């Protein structure tokens, strides 16, 4: 049998080693949380630095326009020229803003009363923490036309913004006079619905520190430049440094809260099927596609096949805008 002395020593050894292991584990846990706090603090400082430096050039001035105080946030818009109303709507993307139209407005204002708008979550407009849905923009477009323009405008959209223009007209048949869509995507791209994977991406982007950091990586100057050169313009040399600065500034105005719109886009909350609405349109719908865009002819034809009154045109050497 084991002596009492050996048993006592074993218990004492177990107590000592167990205590040292517990102390070591506690120390490791403390180190982990300390490093995590330091990492979070560093990322937060990086995020704040990006926000500050992105707006230093102040390209997107607010003095040139006005604000429409909508129920979900203040909406920046401009009004120029005289004539029948023309509303220009930029692509629904947190890097975009009404700056997208800066080259065209001066020409158009000679013949129209030209309105440009920064969509909610974009540019100089408010960027609230909410889930951005297609119907949200249907409401915004409807209310803006009723409260600000006051009559039926012709509307010009770029990219995915065709969706809520068409759906708004479908819900309010006397809302618009016509829709001109520049490089709209395939109608099938609006058929997506949120799933588990897209919901995870949305949740990650909405996180306070990590989500902002991920957003800042996505909207880094080099990534925006790549998007402009490959998607927005057919010739990369047309992307000036001022234009790059404007898109970069737009993406980071409002403490990078454009991430909430990006999160909803990634989560497919801004998508909504439009085929039925295109089919029922009774106002003119003009589709303008760039020949340099992939499947441009197929995309334009799909709209025309859905509604025989749709007119299509193609432009060479042009990108999204």
Task: Show the residue positions of the predicted features.
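Active-site loop/oxyanion-hole signature of alpha/beta-hydrolase fold enzymes
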Residues: 116-156
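Conserved HGGG/HGGXW glycine-rich cap/lid loop of the alpha/beta-hydrolase fold
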Residues: 78-124
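Conserved alpha/beta-hydrolase catalytic His-Asp/Glu region
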Residues: 217-277
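Conserved loop-alpha-helix segment in the C-terminal half of the alpha/beta-hydrolase fold
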Residues: 280-318
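A short loop-to-beta-strand scaffold at the N-terminal edge of the catalytic core in hydrolase folds
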Residues: 67-80
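Alpha-helical membrane-targeting segments
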Residues: 187-234
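Conserved hydrolase catalytic core segment
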Residues: 150-194
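Hydrophobic alpha-helical topogenic segments used for membrane insertion/localization
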Residues: 25-50
């Amino acid at each position: 049998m084991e002596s009492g002395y050996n048993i006592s020593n074993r218990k004492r050894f177990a107590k000592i080693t167990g205590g040292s292991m517990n102390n070591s584990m506690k120390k490791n846990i403390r180190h982990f949380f300390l490093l995590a706090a330091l990492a979070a603090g560093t990322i937060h400082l990086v995020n704040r630095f990006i926000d500050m430096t992105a707006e230093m050039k102040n390209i997107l001035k607010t003095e040139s326009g006005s604000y429409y105080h909508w129920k979900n946030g203040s909406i920046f818009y401009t009004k120029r020229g005289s004539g029948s109303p023309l509303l220009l709507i930029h692509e629904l993307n947190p890097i975009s803003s009404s700056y997208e139209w800066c080259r065209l407005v001066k020409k158009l204002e000679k013949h129209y009363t030209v309105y440009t708008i920064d969509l909610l979550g974009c540019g100089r407009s408010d960027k609230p923490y909410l889930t951005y849905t297609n119907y949200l923009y249907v409401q915004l477009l409807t209310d803006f036309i009723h409260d600000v323009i006051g009559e039926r405008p012709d509307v010009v959209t770029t990219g995915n913004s065709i969706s809520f223009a068409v759906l708004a007209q479908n819900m309010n048949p006397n809302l618009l006079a016509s829709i001109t869509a520049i490089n709209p995507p395939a109608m099938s791209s609006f058929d997506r619905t949120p799933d588990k994977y897209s919901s995870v991406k949305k949740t990650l982007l909405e996180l306070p520190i990590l989500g902002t950091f991920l957003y800042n990586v996505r909207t880094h100057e080099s990534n925006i430049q790549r998007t402009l050169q490959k998607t927005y313009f057919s010739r990369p040399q047309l992307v000036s440094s001022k234009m790059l600065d404007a898109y970069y500034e737009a993406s980071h105005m409002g403490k990078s809260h454009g991430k909430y719109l990006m999160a909803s886009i990634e989560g497919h909350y801004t998508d909504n099927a439009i085929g039925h609405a295109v089919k029922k349109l009774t106002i003119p719908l003009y589709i303008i596609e760039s020949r340099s865009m992939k499947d441009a002819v197929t995309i334009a034809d799909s709209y025309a096949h859905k509604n025989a009154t749709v007119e299509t045109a193609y432009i060479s050497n042009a990108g999204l805008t």
